Amino acid sequence: MAKAKPAWSYETAIAEVEQIVQQLESGELPLAEVVEQFQQASQRLQQCDRFLRDKQAELDLLIESLDEPPVPPQ
């Protein structure tokens, strides 16, 4: 039976990027691995950017709704 892929997590993605950066900074990876790791980090950062933009839009809508006058009870 195939394993279910865990749900995406911002915190996990950032931890993966930090781990990749540590590997890159070690200077011990062959060039092909450096390029592959850099691509993975770039993809994770793009995912994080989309996530943060979406959450910012949600927050903006919530804040905007706070500025609206309350609806009187019927």
UniProtKB/Swiss-Prot annotation:
Single GO biological process annotation from the record: DNA catabolic process
Gene Ontology terms: cellular component: cytosol; exodeoxyribonuclease VII complex
InterPro entries: Exonuc_VII_S, Exonuc_VII_ssu_sf
EC number: 3.1.11.6
This protein's UniProt keywords: Cytoplasm, Exonuclease, Hydrolase, Nuclease
Keyword presence, Plastid: no
Catalysed reactions, as listed in the record: Exonucleolytic cleavage in either 5'- to 3'- or 3'- to 5'-direction to yield nucleoside 5'-phosphates
Chief location bin: cytoplasm
Subunit text: Heterooligomer composed of large and small subunits.
Family, as annotated: Belongs to the XseB family.
Name of this protein: Exodeoxyribonuclease 7 small subunit
Name of the coding gene: xseB
